[in-house]
Amino acid sequence: MGGEEIVWHLTGRIRLDRSPGGTGGVLLDTTSATICSANESAMDLLDILRNGADSHSLVDKLTSDYQVSLRRAVADVDQFLHQLKSLRLVDGQD
């Protein structure tokens, strides 16, 4: 995390559905039929990514809303974005 931050957006074909209790949900890629279950913190990050966010904003969300150290939040966000990119569920732009 340094220099120019990439702003990540969920691709337009993504649908998010939270569980009734709000403790998680599912992500559906309506083109490939990929379905991913997500816990509460992942759903919070996915909600932010709908409108676009850089990794710093995602880290801030984890450290402010969950008892997560900065080091852990950075690692978790890096891994989270890597997974989303590998499934082609996010697009990034400078």
Task: Annotate the PLM regions.
Residues 1-43:
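Acidic, low-complexity/disordered tracts enriched in E/D and polar residues
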Residues 31-94:
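Long, charge-rich, low-complexity alpha-helical segments
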